[in-house]
Amino acid sequence: MDVERWTPDLIPLAKRGQIEAIGVSNHNLAEIKRAGEILAEEGLKISAVQNHFSLLHCSSEKAGILDYCKENGITFCAYMVLEQGALTGHFDTDHPFPEGTGRGEAYNPHLEELAALIQELHSIGAVHQASPAQVATAWAIAKGTLPIIGVTKVRQVEEAAAAAQIVLSDEEVSRLEKLGDEAGVDTLREWEKEME
């Protein structure tokens, strides 16, 4: 990202009221801080950071981005929280993604490695009367993020909203994170970078 080039271009738009808030996506901590410095010189600030964040991809947390956002009043919007459906509990080795699709190519080779995590999402969901997708979403909320959830059905909207009411225990969060790490599945896409 060329923060030095694009950030100044946003300043006149913000000052004229043509944009209400400024956010960045797929930026590491150094880039976020530098964009913030440039904006601060003009009395502006970053309002949101949007990065890939899920039980399988936590590099924004490990890099200190989540903490930085909390400390500076920046909303962290987590995308791919459900890993394009891989963490919904709907897919496993017996029920893979359709062959020949991007999701099938990305996740089908790893469904076995994801089995323990998916089982834990089901188990925790049973305790909270929630689906695995709701548990994965509740985890992202527990980490202080605002999850971006892709939906195609009204039921999915209702389930996503209900996830905000689920309060996971520290022990549940820890179990999920341990299994996410142990799965060892790299879900980074070609347009993304590691944040660490």
What are these regions (language model features)?
Residues 1-196:
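Beta/alpha (TIM)-barrel catalytic core signal, keyed to glycine-rich beta->alpha loops juxtaposed to Asp/Glu
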